Each structure stands twice: as C-alpha cells, then as structure tokens.
Amino acid sequence: MRLEDLRPTPGSMKKRKRVGRGPGSGHGKTSGRGHKGQKARGTGKVHPWFEGGQTPLQRRLPKRGFKNINKKVYAVVNVKVLEEKFEANEEVTPAKLLERKIVKDMKDGIKILGDGELTKPLIVKAHAFSKSALEKIESVGGKAEVI
C-alpha cells in the first residue's frame, strides 16, 4: 500500500449540491423547488401552524376562563409527614419545614392537609389548614396556629 492508493471510505464524502447549473446537474432551472408557489420563493417558509388559509384551530375554538391573579398557591404538607419528621410537642414552623427540606419553596405560604394519622401532639404554625388536618392536630392535644 502506497500513499497515492489511499481513498476515502465509500459514502463518507458526499458531493455538494450545485443548484441552478443546467439540466445536466439534475438541479437546474428551478433548483429542485418545483414551479412557482410560496415554497418556490426566496423566503417561502410556511409555518407549522399555517393551515392553507382556512381559519386556524386556535381561532376556531372559543376563549374560555381566565387566570386569577389573586390566587394563593400554597406549598402543601400532609399530617403523615409531620408525624414522621417531628418529635412530640415540637413546634412546626415554615422555617423548619424549609430547613428539613420537607417543602422546596413557599410561594404564598404553607397549607397543612389531613392525609395520614397523627399520634403525637405538635404545635403547628402555618398559613392555612384543611378541616381534617385541624381536627387531627387538635384531637391528639396539639395546637394549630394560623400565621
């Protein structure tokens, strides 16, 4: 084998497409764009949501509802999590919940929900409570304070 015998692997060197260079090139005259029409033009891009001139789907469907700018978004914590992570008579505050990574972030505060059972009394300070959570906290001798 000599240096002049070396050739690139078949299929690795793709020939450049030279458009508009006569009929013999296979891409002459219209350069592979067909005859006239939007896609034959210089900036003939058709957006994916274009439906050929008919009224698009997002305009055919009615507008519904709205976003309530005053909506409160609470980080939720269930009673069963408090049972696992806190000792009896311990104070549960939003700062402690963040510190122990029980909640990631508080947008408008913390809401305690009533899923699970509670067996030890806790002093829970949160921004909101569900009815079942309030009952469970107070039934075991704990206190629920809205802050």
UniProtKB/Swiss-Prot annotation:
Protein origin, superkingdom: Bacteria
One example GO MF annotation: structural constituent of ribosome
Basic residues: bias regions: 30-44
Gene Ontology cellular component terms for the protein in this record: cytosolic large ribosomal subunit
InterPro entries: Ribosomal_uL15 (IPR030878), Ribosomal_uL15/eL18 (IPR021131), Ribosomal_uL15/eL18_sf (IPR036227), Ribosomal_uL15_bac-type (IPR005749), Ribosomal_uL15_CS (IPR001196)
Record's keyword terms, sorted: Ribonucleoprotein, Ribosomal protein, RNA-binding, rRNA-binding
Region (Disordered): 1-57
Residues annotated as signal peptide: none
Family: Belongs to the universal ribosomal protein uL15 family.
NCBIfam families (alphabetical): rplO_bact
Protein name: Large ribosomal subunit protein uL15
Species in which this protein is naturally found: Thermotoga neapolitana (strain ATCC 49049 / DSM 4359 / NBRC 107923 / NS-E)
Lineage: Bacteria, Thermotogati, Thermotogota, Thermotogae, Thermotogales
